[in-house]
């Protein structure tokens, strides 16, 4: 009888414990589905950010290449301008020389 008394006292205790574990398992299963859905959503967002980052990297590379090309063009234009300014200065000096020479010849005549 003592054994039967212990079994009957423990059975409700274990039944309650089992029920609690079942509820926790159901909650864990529900959380698993929710978390799986959230994970998928976050992975999609991450993929979007990765694509955008790669696009921005490509745009930056393109911009850097364009900058290098423009810098070459500007450097060439600056050198051309310097050459033209030197030519203008040389022509001004030649014109002044020829004018003075002409004036001297006129004076001599």
UniProtKB/Swiss-Prot annotation:
| One Gene Ontology term of the molecular function aspect | structural constituent of skin epidermis
Question: Residue ranges of the IF rod domain?
Answer: 1-109
UniProt-listed GO biological process terms: intermediate filament organization; keratinization
PROSITE patterns per record: IF_ROD_2
UniProt KW keywords: Coiled coil, Intermediate filament, Keratin
Question: Which superkingdom?
Answer: Eukaryota
- Region spans: Coil 1B: 11-109
Q: Where is this region: Linker 1?
A: 1-10
Q: Does the keyword Coiled coil apply?
A: yes
One Gene Ontology cellular component: keratin filament
- Alphabetized Gene3D superfamilies for the sequence: Vasodilator-stimulated phosphoprotein (1.20.5.1160)
Biological function? Wool microfibrillar keratin.
Assigned protein family? Belongs to the intermediate filament family.
Beyond the main fields, what else does the record say? There are two types of cytoskeletal and microfibrillar keratin: I (acidic; 40-55 kDa) and II (neutral to basic; 56-70 kDa).
**Name recorded for this polypeptide:** Keratin, type II microfibrillar
